[in-house]
């Protein structure tokens, strides 16, 4: 009887299908340029303060979450999910939305102009996206 119970218990435990669903949505950089990508629900781009790692920020889980880049010739540490190198994927940019906006700035532009000037002159690309634009949580 004990063997039968263990058999049924092991079948019920090991036969469970675990469905891992992706959390978040990604964007793929299919260009030769390094890009800064931001996805949000607002129809205006942020001031850039979310992209840059501040050493006093305590939410960083490891230094692997950041990458160095340049803004106006100065070394700047970005969160990896905003800084997307050529032919690679961003980190999870956004989790749950019906409609969102994807903002993209080329790092070449970010290294020549201030964030304020980029925003004022609209030197970025903006796309309006819905969940239908993502295939397997990824936008290309």
Kindly give the residue locations of the regions a language model identified:
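Intrinsically disordered, low-complexity segments enriched in small/polar residues
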Residues: 16-26, 36-140
């Amino acid at each position: 009887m004990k063997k039968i119970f263990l058999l049924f218990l092991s079948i019920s435990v090991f036969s469970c299908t675990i469905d891992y669903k992706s959390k978040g949505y990604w964007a793929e950089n299919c260009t030769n340029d390094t890009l800064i990508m931001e996805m949000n629900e607002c129809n205006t781009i942020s001031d850039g303060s979310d992209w840059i790692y501040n050493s006093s920020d305590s939410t960083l889980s490891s230094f692997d979450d950041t990458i160095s880049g340049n803004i106006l010739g100065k070394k700047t540490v970005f969160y990896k999910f905003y800084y997307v190198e050529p032919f690679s994927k961003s980190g999870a940019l956004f989790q749950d939305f019906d409609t969102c906006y994807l903002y993209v700035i080329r790092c070449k532009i970010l290294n020549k102009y201030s964030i304020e000037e980029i925003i004022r002159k609209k030197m970025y690309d903006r796309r309006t996206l819905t969940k239908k634009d993502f295939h397997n949580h990824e936008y290309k």
